[in-house]
């Protein structure tokens, strides 16, 4: 009877998708000879030839890491990038400004809006490189895919219509709502060994599980690639992570990165590429490697990647890319000197070794992804910190952990519990990563197994992971509560808008097991659960399949993109009265002098993530409308003077919200700066966290340190990121102080060469001078002088 019910639900879902197909696939063009190539095959011949040129520039005896090989073989001009300011190529890492030409760009629906609005202003007929848009961030997770998907499509129709029409006009592959999460779709369709791509999402490095250099960027950076302008990256240092042994028992690939995050912290990877190597690599599946690379974003790494592995071949073949598998295997057969492996004598700036054979499961959180605790010590840690000993929901899936392997390992545990007569004591939610994964799990009865346990299958989208979760368990806002997820990020308020929801990150199999106890102190390795019959039940370690034995099921064809064909006859409409979309007005250029009379809008205490600066969740609806979304600027920031959140005070002591005070000052023509602590802008590639302050009159962000992506995004939008030369000076500057820059204008005019100071006038009239540092390159200086990178591109 149960299978019949599940079958009826699946049939109803297929009927629903068929009904939605016209609005999902409306009028997409078909391929013609004039179409720019949308081949999933990387340009291997060109890349290999470029690597040969790099070896000529640096000398054939120079040993290169895998990351260096792929990056340098994508340089626009190898000699210029590698030999300028690098002691004739001897000091490239951390010093060279690499001018790169990526192979591909991927964008998700929330960030694609602003990226496209910027691209459209450049006036080109099509994108210069293959590009794709994936509608995943704006789908709500609440009661299940059958209800949530059509409601989300209807509620976001204007935005989806805009994205689809722009895709048709400019020749971009459009993956409609419900097709899947960007990173899972990229892994299944576009990622390949040796590829270099950009994505407008911080978890783009997920593609590194298949041997690609994939870097998360803001929309302005993506536009560089889309218009065929070289994209600039400070040459990263390389962190080598050597994997030895093989995972045992309950340990999963997720535990490798959870453990590593605890070692490195949220900023320990800043300025580094994490390059995995060693004999343990070949014990991991492709999707397991992708999970590890995905969460490299949580330690601030530029990207993460794995070398070519024999396990890449069956995955590529299973995802209809046998030609890519054959080509990559042929290149890799040349050994360590090939494009797809590090040279034997390559040196790493830092090296960490992890023994997989002794690694135990880890749980990270709450409120930060680097608070890592081994499972064996977690119960003790819960009690020590007075965290809740029960939890409300377990959520598995997402871009980090929705592979066939992940789901079948979780399914194995559900089957064990079903046989023992157990039901989950916490709500269980399942998010398939793509239509291909969902359809395959449906065919193989995995989804019916989850449903038999009362699990709710959400749409193939981000949902709760990005804050699109409408909880139905009536937890009051501000109330301490716990959830367990297999997601990648757990900042306060991220999932449900409640800053007191404690999200503990773990593998999907561990999350699944814990839901049956409903207890944060349960250890499935050692603890048992009493069954309805009174017997004691203990889980066996989970097992699963890397790939489906029957192959992947494609699923509903309505979710497949058509071949990209630019069509200039397609009109891309943006209504002047829209509350969701607004064309961009150019930012004003930098004045012909240093900045004067900047007021300190706010002094931030502690962690300030991109979620803090530009919240997601219900605000995602305004991603294409800069004036409207600017109303959430810094609403999660804590006032250093008072400890209040989103409470700012003007010179008269009057209280305001931060965006309200910023808007008032903008209306008065007053420009301002923000003062912050470490790793400002930690988290996502969300360029709105740079656009919004700029729109409201922000000129400078002064911090102890910055997250890499956010620092770049600020420069692209004409905001100057400065750091304290002496971090103790953070205590010398306060809200409403007045600041003038000294030496900044000359530094910008000199292409980033020069020293900068800030002259600060206190409320008392006292003046102090604070020396500051910057990382401005020549190109970045030109962006700021012009007002933004887009202003520079538009003139070209």
Swiss-Prot record:
Key word Mitochondrion present: yes
Keyword presence, Lyase: yes
Binding site for [4Fe-4S] cluster: 399, 462, 465
Database matches in Pfam families: Aconitase, Aconitase_C
InterPro entries membership: Acnase/IPM_dHydase_lsu_aba_1/3 (IPR015931), Acoase/IPM_deHydtase_lsu_aba (IPR001030), Aconitase/3IPM_dehydase_swvl (IPR015928), Aconitase/IPM_isomerase (IPR050926), Aconitase_4Fe-4S_BS (IPR018136), Aconitase_4Fe-4S_dom (IPR036008), Aconitase_dom2 (IPR015932), Aconitase_mito-like (IPR006248)
Disordered as annotated region, ranges: 540-569
A GO BP entry: tricarboxylic acid cycle
Name of the protein in question: Putative aconitate hydratase, mitochondrial
Residues involved in substrate binding: 108, 201-203, 489, 494, 685-686
Ranges in coiled-coil conformation: none
A GO term, aspect molecular function: aconitate hydratase activity
Subcellular localization(s) per the UniProt record: Mitochondrion
Primary location recorded for the protein, binned into one broad class: mitochondrion
